[in-house]
């Protein structure tokens, strides 16, 4: 299928992880009327993508814990997932259930994107047993009744959460990044915050692979260009003075305030 070709090329362009997204339960209701992605992937897609990839890891986002979780997670592992992500959990018990089902058979990442997951953050970190964490800004800002996805970044919430992961030695990331020069909050600002906060992972926004590209070769060129520009900018960040990041925080707050006013 055409989408499988895109996944292979994403790997060749330097994307280190390729997703299969099984999450459907509750997502439509949470994000009703929003211009967000509902992937519609299936368990069969895991096997197809696994066969395509040679160097990139295969990350599968499963559904939040429900009565069919054990069967779903077992099949995801059998089909070759390298990492399984648990989304939209609210309790320590849900995390514990997830980790018990996986039982060390592949890597695990927790997607902190509900108000309750943040309220139980210390307990979840103390429980341990998961490999990494990601902060999902879209559902998180909705959960807190905020207006704009990047409010948790501008108001210091993401920084506080990242500090706890860092102290616990848990690799972490947050949100996603658009192409350099794009986004309501420019990608450069977001990437600089990733660097400042010690984040080591982010999700590429749909602007890298949306429906505007009907010509495959044009998409391939634009995709590689977008990745190269991000990598170049990332390589410059360690050389920049602290004042750059102080000014960047100010810009993040200003740009977010413009959106929410």
Protein language model features and the residues they cover:
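Short, small-residue-biased leader/transition segments that mark boundaries at the very start
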Residues: 2-6
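Catalytic domains of carbohydrate-active enzymes, especially glycoside hydrolases
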Residues: 7-23, 79, 198-200
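Surface-exposed amphipathic alpha-helices with a cationic face
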Residues: 11, 46-54, 77, 96-103, ...
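Conserved beta-strand positions in the central sheet of alpha/beta enzyme cores
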Residues: 18-19, 85, 134, 203
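Active-site pocket-lining/capping segments in soluble small-molecule metabolic enzymes
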Residues: 19-21, 26-33, 41, 170-261
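Active-site-adjacent beta->alpha loops and helix N-cap segments on the catalytic face
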Residues: 27-47, 66-70, 88-106, 117-120, ...
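Glycine/small-residue-rich loop that forms an oxyanion/phosphate-binding "nest" at active or ligand-binding sites
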Residues: 57-86
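Catalytic alpha/beta core domains of metabolic enzymes, predominantly
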Residues: 107-217, 225-226
């Amino acid at each position: 299928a055409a989408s499988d070709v895109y996944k292979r090329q994403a790997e060749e362009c330097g994307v280190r992880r390729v997703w299969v997204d099984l999450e459907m339960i509750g997502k439509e209701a949470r994000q009703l009327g929003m211009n967000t992605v509902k992937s519609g992937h299936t368990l069969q897609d895991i096997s197809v993508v696994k066969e395509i990839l040679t160097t990139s890891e295969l990350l599968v986002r499963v559904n939040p814990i429900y009565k069919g979780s054990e069967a779903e997670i077992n099949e995801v592992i059998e089909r070759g997932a390298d990492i399984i992500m648990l989304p939209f959990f609210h309790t320590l018990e849900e995390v514990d259930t997830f980790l018990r089902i996986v039982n060390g058979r592949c890597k695990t990442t927790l997607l902190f994107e509900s108000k309750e997951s943040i309220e139980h953050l210390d307990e979840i970190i103390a429980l341990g047993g998961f490999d990494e964490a990601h902060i999902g800004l879209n559902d998180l800002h909705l959960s807190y009744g905020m207006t704009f996805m990047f409010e948790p970044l501008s108001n210091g919430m993401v920084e506080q959460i990242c500090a706890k992961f860092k102290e616990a030695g848990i690799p972490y990331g947050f949100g996603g990044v658009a192409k350099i020069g794009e986004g309501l909050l420019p990608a450069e600002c977001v990437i600089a915050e990733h660097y400042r906060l010690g984040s080591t992972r982010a999700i590429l926004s749909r602007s890298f692979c949306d429906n505007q590209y009907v010509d495959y070769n044009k998409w391939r060129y634009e995709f590689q260009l977008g990745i190269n520009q991000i990598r170049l900018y990332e390589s410059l960040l360690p050389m920049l003075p602290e004042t750059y990041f102080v000014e960047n925080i100010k810009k993040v707050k200003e740009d977010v305030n413009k959106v929410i006013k």
